[in-house]
Structure formats: structure tokens, C-alpha cells
Amino acid sequence: MASFGLKRGCLLLPAILIAFLPADAQQFPDRFTNLQVLPKDISKRELLSTMRSFAFALDVRCEHCHVQKDKEIDYGSDDKQSKKTARVMLQMVGTINRDYIGKVSNPKSIQVECVTCHHGLTQPQPLKAVLIEEQEKQGIDGTINLYRDLRSRYYGTGQYDFGETTLNQFTEFLLAKNMHKEAVAIMEMNFAANNPQSVWTYHILAMSHEQNGEIDKAKADYRKVVELHPEDSWAQKQLDLLSQRK
């Protein structure tokens, strides 16, 4: 919609689908009394479709933002902070689409929407940030359990990047903190989950093993790198240095 940065009409919900919406959406009023960011002349169908897109983007229901009393939704109430936050986010999206997107691309072809960042998460965070937070609270075992749980629930749905890059970056964070044992645990899980073949991933596995005092494993890692990529002179040098150790 033009006034807040989404294309008006692009989210229209077919009338036949309205009958199959959850009960809270079927309570939708015919007149709207408290529109502050969305166009005041918006149609019921368009507003319902827009709100539905918000709900899908955050994986929430109407009562996430709207007050519910005795199984009925008070759509006009501003009592919930989440509704106030949603307005701010809509204003932010509008500013991005109106004032910035057009400067770097064709504004008709690219538009930021809620789902652009949220991807079905109420609180969108990169997986690396989630793992760092869990490591600080629950240690490495809790972190590994969380990764496996999230992967089992969200793999292939777009909420998180479960690939080797995320775990490589998380391992680099652990190594910088001298958490060598934890780094090894993450990288071994990385190989078990993703079966990576990149030089970068093998390098980090080797460095983790080396810094954790597992020299034989580190040498095996570097041998694998040289086998896969004979031109990798750095890996060959590291292997030679480790082989000279007594």
C-alpha cells in the first residue's frame, strides 16, 4: 500500500477464503475506528488480507497485537505494546520502500515487507546470534540440543540458515574466546549435519582440533584439505608444521 510501503492490492484475499479463516479473523469489523498508519479508506477485504500477511510473516494470530476479551477481539484497543510496535515497524517499512529502495533499484520490482526479515519468526534473529545466546546461558550441550531442535522444526522453511556457514562463523566466535573444546563439538556436529566439503570448513575443523590439543586429528583434517584441493599451499604448510611436532 502506497502510504506505508506495500503495493496496494497485491495482498488481496479471495472472498471465498474469508469463510475459512479462524474465528478471530471472522470477527473482523465492517468499520475501522483506529487506523493510524494504514490508509483510512482501506477496504475490509484489503485490510483483512494485509493483517493476514502480517500474521503469516510472524507466525502469530490476531491476539498477538489485539486485545482479546471473552473470546472477542477488540481491534480498536491500543493496550498491547505489540500493536504499538507493529505501527512503528510499518512506518519503518514505509520509509525504507519510499525513501531508500528506489535509490538502489527499481522500486516497482522490490518492496520490503514484514516477511523480508521475519520469515515466520516473531523475534527474527540470525541462527548464529541464537546459538551465542544459548551458549552463554546453557553451555555447549544446551547449544547443540537447541540447534538440533530448531533444525528438526525449521529445516527447509527459511527461518534460519542451518548450513555450514552459520556453524563456521559460530566456531570462529568460540575460538576467539579460547573455547577450544566447544569449538570442536560444534564443528564435529557441523560435519555430521551438513557433510561439508569446503576448504574453509575443513580449515576451521583442523584449527579447532589443533587448538584443543588433538594434533593427529588436525593433521588428518589438513590431509583431507590437500587431498580435495592440492593447490592449497597454506593447508600443506600447516600439515608440515604439525608433522614436525614431537
Enumerate the predicted regions with their spans.
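Sequence context surrounding c-type heme c attachment/ligation sites in exported
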Residues: D24-A176, N194-S198, Q211, E231, ...
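Canonical positions in the second alpha-helix
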Residues: N190-F191, K224-V225
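Bacterial N-terminal signal peptides
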Residues: C10-F20
